[in-house]
């Protein structure tokens, strides 16, 4: 694998990790916090994760050599998670069990990407 491709994979992986970190905080706040401002705080982290997600998707589309089912699944699952989190925030849902389930699915897709990156790092 050439160095340019390795750099692009690393760059996309960084976008994935940043998106994951912010959406995780947004979901954790919406699911577990017990205060009246939790939805506003969650929305802030959702916005932050969405900005990184958009940048990741742009980078992915511009670099066709990065196309893989793992990244496609990441983007599809993020879209579903984002919609569910918006629903929880907009309705101030007190029982976000579907959000929890969607986040677990998203987390699995991130783990799949992490596994792919490990395999690619070991490939010479």
Annotate each predicted stretch with a short phrase.
Residues 23-37, 56-63, 85-96, 120-124:
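Secondary-structure edge/capping motif, primarily at the C-terminal ends of alpha-helices
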Residues 15-22, 45-48, 52-55, 77-84, ...:
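Amphipathic, well-ordered alpha-helical segments in soluble domains
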Residues 38-43, 67-80, 106:
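Charge-rich, acidic-biased intrinsically disordered regions
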Residues 3, 10, 33, 40, ...:
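Register-specific recognition of a single heptad position within extended alpha-helical repeats
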Residues 76-124:
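Amphipathic alpha-helical binding modules
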Residues 1-47:
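Short terminal alpha-helical segments
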Residues 1, 6, 38, 64, ...:
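Low-complexity, intrinsically disordered short peptide segments enriched in small/polar/basic residues
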Residues 50-75:
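Short, solvent-exposed, charged loop/turn and helix-capping segments
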């Amino acid at each position: 694998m050439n160095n340019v491709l390795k750099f692009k994979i690393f760059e996309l992986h960084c976008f994935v990790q940043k998106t994951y970190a912010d959406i995780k905080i947004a979901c954790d706040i919406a699911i577990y916090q017990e205060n009246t401002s939790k939805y506003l705080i969650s929305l802030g982290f959702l916005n932050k994760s969405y900005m990184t997600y958009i940048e990741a998707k742009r980078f992915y589309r511009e670099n066709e050599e990065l196309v893989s089912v793992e990244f496609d699944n990441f983007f599809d699952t993020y879209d579903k998670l984002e919609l569910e989190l918006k629903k929880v925030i907009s309705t101030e849902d007190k029982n976000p069990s579907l959000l929890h389930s969607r986040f677990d699915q998203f987390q699995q897709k991130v783990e799949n990407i992490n596994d792919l990156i490990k395999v690619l790092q070991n490939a010479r």
